[in-house]
Amino acid sequence: MTRIEVEYCVPCGMLNRAQDVSRALLEQFGEAIDEVALVTGDDGVFAVRAADETVFDKTEDEYDVDAIVRAVKPYVGATA
């Protein structure tokens, strides 16, 4: 089972984006995920980590929920 963290910038108003990613991951992988944790941050951060590996960082990647789900998939081992 996998723990996923979605770290988002609170002052930047990225909560909705973090919730969208969390919802998409839970809908796609369901019980194959141990937990999806929303982690508050600042300084424009928006990153997704699966099993302690960064799979998305907005400083390096363009925001795309489907791409984030695909990046998480190898860590979950679920069939989608």
Provide a role label for each language-model segment.
Residues F46-T54:
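A short, hydrophobic beta-strand/beta-hairpin element that forms part of a small beta-sheet core
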Residues M1-G30, L38:
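Local sequence-structure signature of Cys/Sec-based thiol-disulfide redox active-site neighborhoods
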Residues I33-D34, A80:
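Secondary-structure boundary/capping signal
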Residues D34-A47:
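Short edge beta-strands and adjacent turn/loop segments
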Residues R23, E27, E31, R70, ...:
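Short, intrinsically disordered, mixed-charge
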Residues T54-A80:
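Non-catalytic, surface beta->alpha helical segment in thiol-disulfide oxidoreductase systems
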